[in-house]
Amino acid sequence: MSEFSDYYVVYQRVGEHAMVLVGHKNDTPRALTANQFQENTNRWFYFENGFRDEDTSQGIHHQLCNLHMSGRKMMVKRELYLALRHIEIAGAQWLRAVIINDDDTYHDDYHYLNFYENPVDEDYAYYDFVDFDKSEYKAKKYADYLPPLYTFKKVVLSPEKLAAVPLEKRLIWDDLQFTDCLVVHKSVKEIMEKYQPLDCRFTRIEEYQEDMGTRAEYDADGNLIC
């Protein structure tokens, strides 16, 4: 298998650990989704379960773990952060984060990976699309600062485009304009797996489908993939 196929999309697993993490209402992080926060990073950023009331009313209590995904937002505990912080990530920065659990317990040993600018432009993406038509993009924007998300059925990596960039500069990347996916190299995936990332799944980028992470997934025998 080609060295250029060793990439995985990281996304949220559907299950008991899954939380929709949002910035606390009295703090700044809601603006982080604009990918523009580049100020002093020595402060703390607070996040909480966006569906806390609904979950607790149904008796759902979330267990915090070493890695949490909420959409393409990734938060990792300090031990995993220390294992990843040496990696050069274009257009991104690590911010110190606090997750407020549903029982109002503050967990201040997390770091949030904030992409403050799009590291991949339209003319220099690392992949091509199959069954992709720019005229079919979703016209509705979620907010003024979010670009339209294009519809795709399959992503195919481009060995030529990848070869033009040293491996150490493309171990972790996120295309904010087209697929809106967090992508990691196999070597990074192996580091993450050592820390039992219960809240996320890894799927080879060429097997990734647009709605993964928003629905339950089943194996060939019809069993729920947990």
Give the positions of each predicted feature.
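Intrinsically disordered, low-complexity boundary segments flanking structured domains
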Residues: 32-34, 79-82, 97-102, 158-159, ...
